[in-house]
């Protein structure tokens, strides 16, 4: 039983070996406009732990360019910054496969990590209850 608990805890702590997959496109520099048409998510370089979406707005608050890709930054600070002539650039990050693919961006929780956490927590509670009963 101790081995099972140790194995589950180890799986929770050690990151999975598969690389993160993010949508990667650069607005007008690719065949996809990155706003409404995006390519399939691709593997990120090993050190990149998050996906990003970078939106650039003009002074009329119109979305003029979108970039999407991989990064090792969790959250930009601040998320939005002023850029020339009253425009702004906002960067959003997330950490699950393909989470930066939506036209409107939403932060996603990696489901596999949540399942591992729930299983680990359940096994630990069962172990504690079992040992305290004896």
Swiss-Prot record:
- Signal peptide (from-to): 1-19
- Gene Ontology MF annotations: toxin activity
Where is it localised? Secreted
Query: What do the Gene Ontology cellular component annotations say?
Result: extracellular region
Superkingdom in the source lineage? Eukaryota
Q: Which residues cross the membrane?
A: none
Q: PTM per UniProt?
A: Contains 5 disulfide bonds.
Task: Decide whether keyword Signal is in the record.
Answer: yes
Q: Report whether Secreted shows up as a keyword of the record.
A: yes
Q: Which UniProt keywords apply?
A: Disulfide bond, Secreted, Signal, Toxin
Its predominant location is: secreted
Q: Which InterPro entries match?
A: Snake_toxin-like_sf (IPR045860)
Q: In which tissues is it expressed?
A: Expressed by the venom gland.
What the record says about family reads: Belongs to the scoloptoxin-05 family.
Quote additional remarks. The scoloptoxin-05 family has remarkable similarities with the three-finger toxin family commonly found in snakes.
- Quote the protein name from its UniProt record: U-scoloptoxin(05)-Er2a
Natural source organism: Ethmostigmus rubripes (Giant centipede)
């Amino acid at each position: 039983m101790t081995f099972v608990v140790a194995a589950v805890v180890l799986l929770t702590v050690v990151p999975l070996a598969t690389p993160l997959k993010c949508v990667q496109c650069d607005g007008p520099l690719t065949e996809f406009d990155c706003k409404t048409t995006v390519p399939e998510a691709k593997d990120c370089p090993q050190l990149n732990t998050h996906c990003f979406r970078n939106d650039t707005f003009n002074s009329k608050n119109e979305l003029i360019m979108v970039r999407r890709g991989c990064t090792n930054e969790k959250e930009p600070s601040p998320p939005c910054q002023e850029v020339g002539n009253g425009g702004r650039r906002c960067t959003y990050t997330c950490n699950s496969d393909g989470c930066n693919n939506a036209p409107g961006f939403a932060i996603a929780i990696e489901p596999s990590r949540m399942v591992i956490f729930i299983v680990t927590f359940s096994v630990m509670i069962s172990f504690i209850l079992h040992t305290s009963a004896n």
